[in-house]
Amino acid sequence: MAEARASRWYFGGLASCGAACCTHPLDLLKVHLQTQQEVKLRMTGMALQVVRTDGFLALYNGLSASLCRQMTYSLTRFAIYETMRDYMTKDSQGPLPFYNKVLLGGISGLTGGFVGTPADLVNVRMQNDMKLPPSQRRNYSHALDGLYRVAREESLRKLFSGATMASSRGALVTVGQLSCYDQAKQLVLSTGYLSDNIFTHFVSSFIAGGCATFLCQPLDVLKTRLMNSKGEYQGVFHCAMETAKLGPQAFFKGLFPAGIRLIPHTVLTFMFLEQLRKHFGIKVPTT
């Protein structure tokens, strides 16, 4: 009897944290590009400006908030998706149909997006702080300090500013990443040319990262603008209308850096996740 291993519910959060440590500078540059009122700098120019102005370590501003976000948002969506997927397939002979994976991904992402909104808000603010004049900077010491100060100075409700947008984006990203990864891996393995190895994980996660980038970019731009606002937007629709005034391309501002960040992040997340599953997962006997 052969032996397989299933992922533990918290592996998704750990894998996402590992990926976030590698891709955080790209995430920071993406936020900077999206919060420009006009297109002035591209990714390389923005990176050089940040390093020149605040030093190399400034590329890791807000890392604690990013890790906090992964341990709320990503842990929740991975835990729900993988737990429900494994439950739904434990007595079946084959994998879930793709539409079921999409449904699971949507539900998991909506829930994870809502749970992760407070940490996401602090993450965006910490990354964008260096762009503000010194007198206007929030200067959060770390993620927990940011969460506490937002709740104390602006209200608990403010912690969930942009929750609708974050949840919607979470659903799209999770469909793009988890659902498409499962489907891509299934299709790659079904060819018979590749086995369940690191190269298969790389190819499948690269495809998933591309799908997630295209699905969520317009919502990602609106979410970032809403979370970084000081009350100038009345809601999601108003934010969308104001962004539309800048032209259709405004909804895809930062698309290239978003892909440069999200695709490697997706690849690293699933590479870490598969290694965690392989070495530390729950043993599942199979015939």
Swiss-Prot record:
The lineage of its organism: Eukaryota, Metazoa, Chordata, Craniata, Vertebrata. Keywords: Acetylation, Antiport, Lipid transport, Membrane, Mitochondrion, Mitochondrion inner membrane, Repeat, Transmembrane, Transmembrane helix, Transport. The chain crosses the membrane at residues 9-29, 62-81, 102-122, 162-181, 202-222, 254-274. Signal peptide: none annotated. Regulated by circadian protein CLOCK (Circadian Locomotor Output Cycles Kaput). It comes from the Eukaryota. InterPro entries: Mit_carrier (IPR002067), Mito_Metabolite_Transporter (IPR050391), Mitochondrial_sb/sol_carrier (IPR018108), Mt_carrier_dom_sf (IPR023395). The modification N6-acetyllysine is found at residue 158. The keyword Secreted does not apply. Expressed at very high levels in white adipose tissue. And at low levels in brown adipose tissue, kidney and liver. Its main location: mitochondrion. The gene is Slc25a10. GO terms for biological process: gluconeogenesis; glyceraldehyde-3-phosphate biosynthetic process; lipid transport; mitochondrial transport. This is Mitochondrial dicarboxylate carrier. Catalyzes the electroneutral exchange or flux of physiologically important metabolites such as dicarboxylates (malonate, malate, succinate), inorganic sulfur-containing anions, and phosphate, across mitochondrial inner membrane. Plays an important role in gluconeogenesis, fatty acid metabolism, urea synthesis, and sulfur metabolism, particularly in liver, by supplying the substrates for the different metabolic processes. Regulates fatty acid release from adipocytes, and contributes to systemic insulin sensitivity. It is a multi-pass membrane protein. It is found in: Mitochondrion inner membrane. It catalyses: (S)-malate(in) + phosphate(out) = (S)-malate(out) + phosphate(in); malonate(out) + (S)-malate(in) = malonate(in) + (S)-malate(out); (S)-malate(in) + succinate(out) = (S)-malate(out) + succinate(in); (S)-malate(in) + sulfate(out) = (S)-malate(out) + sulfate(in).
